[in-house]
Amino acid sequence: MTGEHKRSSLIKRITNETKIQIALSLDGGPVSLAQSLFKDKDYSAEHAAQATSSQFISVNTGIGFLDHMLHALAKHGGWSVIIECVGDLHIDDHHSAEDTGIALGMAFKEALGHVRGIKRFGSGFAPLDEALSRAVIDMSNRPYAVVDLGLKREKIGDLSCEMIPHVLESFAQGAHVTMHVDCLRGFNDHHRAESAFKALAIAIKEAISSNGTDDIPSTKGVLF
């Protein structure tokens, strides 16, 4: 990882089902979009937003609990990010949740660039009251995800519980990473899901941190 590479990206992903745009900086700092998808309507009361001296986070997928999870991922990963999605929520939450995961993964992959001078592997544990989750990740260029959260409810807010692991799987697909995310214990599904996203944030932050060299961390000599 060199000091000259600004680890940021700006992407748009448009299908017949969703319109998504994301501005991402993996190291925090300012981010912006040229034009919001929501220019004609004030969604400020409906999305997850936070601004500090080191981070700017604004997430609006139209699905409140998904916004909450992505806010936690960005906050504890040290990112600045704007995520906007307009999707076919009149059908259900599947396309918006899945496509947001894919698009965020794509933005992450583009922002990270060539895997050089980073640790590559990361792991993290995060508790939330009675819940405890573990995440392990590899910047491998091998998209694969094993996610076991043990959720029992049908929905949390407007997000189907079956979509929560699928969002993580979709992120892995878009980012071309290998990751294992497990909730080890807990009985509150909100806590189980949130601790999982926080654990993943911690794992990602470690994996993309500097290893003190400019080497590609692979015996193959090539990643991404």
Swiss-Prot record:
One of its GO terms (biological process) is L-histidine biosynthetic process. Gene3D superfamilies: Imidazole glycerol phosphate dehydratase, domain 1. It is an enzyme of class 4 (lyase). Keywords: Amino-acid biosynthesis, Histidine biosynthesis, Lyase. It comes from the Eukaryota. InterPro entries: IGPD_sf, ImidazoleglycerolP_deHydtase, ImidazoleglycerP_deHydtase_CS, Ribosomal_Su5_D2-typ_SF. Pathway: Amino-acid biosynthesis; L-histidine biosynthesis; L-histidine from 5-phospho-alpha-D-ribose 1-diphosphate: step 6/9. SUPFAM superfamilies: Ribosomal protein S5 domain 2-like. One of its GO terms (molecular function) is imidazoleglycerol-phosphate dehydratase activity. Its EC number is 4.2.1.19. Disulfide bonds: none annotated. It catalyses: D-erythro-1-(imidazol-4-yl)glycerol 3-phosphate = 3-(imidazol-4-yl)-2-oxopropyl phosphate + H2O. Pfam families: IGPD. HAMAP family: HisB (MF_00076). Belongs to the imidazoleglycerol-phosphate dehydratase family. This is Imidazoleglycerol-phosphate dehydratase. The gene is HIS3.
